[in-house]
Amino acid sequence: MATKETWKVVTPIQSRDRIVWPVADPTLLQPSNANPLVMGELLQLDSAGKLIRATDDTKPSWCLIDSAGRADVQAISSVTVIGVDAMMFDTLVFDNAAAPALGAVLMQATVTNAAASLTNKSGFKTHAAGGEQVMGHVIQIAANNGGYLRVLMSRA
């Protein structure tokens, strides 16, 4: 489990931006899980309408904003996600082996950030040339932001 904050909001989040949604696998909310969900990870809806770790880069994804291990989140097996309006945030959940450049278009992918001890997380990487969903743009590179990638996400 990461001991450093994995995600920090730069712009305010209004109530209309947040949605509490059930997760398909409540064990991912437990810190003892081998690969638990962490704040800032991207989640998508499965065929049952529940949230799962994002794996399909052609579908919309939303950022998880609950801290890992919260008892209330585990009790209701639901998490809070955002991504309705434009927002800016700093994240460690990105591919730091191929760190996105300033202005880069971002997509969802399974990523590792060795510097932050995050492995196989659903996060951000530089957009490929295919039909993947655009998740945001880099507005400050990690090297100039304490290791965090600053992202501007603007989607409906």
Protein language model annotation of sequence segments:
Residues 1-156:
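Surface-exposed, low-hydrophobicity beta-strand/loop segments enriched in small/polar/acidic residues
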